[in-house]
Amino acid sequence: MINFKQFLEEERKNPKSKTLHAFDMDEVLFHHDHSKVKVHVKDQHGKKVQSLTNQEYNSHKLPHGHSYDYSEFRSSKVFKKSATPIHKMIHKLKAIHKNNKNVEIVTARSDMDDKHGFMKTLKHHGIDPHEVHVRRAGNTGAASPAEAKHKVIGDLVKKHGYKRVHLYDDSKDNLEKFKSLKHDHPDVEFHAHHVEYHPETGHVKLTTTKA
């Protein structure tokens, strides 16, 4: 027997479709003022030694004995202040969802400190979190964002039997790791869409590769 949360999750899906579209959140659906939100690196004494933007964090290698401070990335208030919608990508998400309900947001973030405040901000920008599930890959405890998303999407493929999976992400590392799922699922098509957003012009460039 499934619980109520699982029931709501299944209601979002189209069981007839074997295609999943997964969207990264930061720098794909929302651009951020990097002066307002960063991941901080602390040394073994708890002293802040470095601050990373979302894009820098994606490829950062944590030195031995150091740790990450995600407090700004877990703050719903900071998200509301720093996030600017990338309208072309949000429109794309909504258009795909209209025809195929199997659309999810897969973010490297973990749980936000104010779930309802975060959901309210998403809805304000046209994304209904009751319709589009937000997978928080940061909760997996994986060593990197790429490995975390690899695990989350791999689990979804196993659970729902998807035959075509699309990932829209601004990190090439994340996309390369995503395509490596082909080794475990040779009968599945993996479409990696690299998203480059230029805030000065509002231009979005998509580059697609396939595994």
Regions flagged by a language model, labelled:
Residues 15-143:
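Alpha-helical substrate-recognition element adjacent to the catalytic core
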Residues 88, 113, 117-120, 148, ...:
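Extracytoplasmic/secreted proteins, especially bacterial periplasmic and envelope-associated proteins
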Residues 19, 101, 131-132, 163-165, ...:
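Residue-level recognition of the N-termini of beta-strands and the immediately preceding loop/turn
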Residues 142-157, 204-211:
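Short, surface-exposed amphipathic charged segments that create phosphate/polyanion-binding patches used
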Residues 19, 149-172, 178:
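Conserved Lys-Pro-Asp/Glu-containing loop-to-beta segment of HAD-superfamily phosphomonoesterases
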Residues 98, 119-128, 155-159, 179-188:
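Short, surface-exposed basic-aromatic patches at helix termini and helix-loop junctions that form
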Residues 164-166, 172-211:
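Asp-based, Mg2+/Mn2+-dependent phosphohydrolase catalytic module
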Residues 2-11, 207:
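Proteolytic processing junctions in secreted/extracellular precursors
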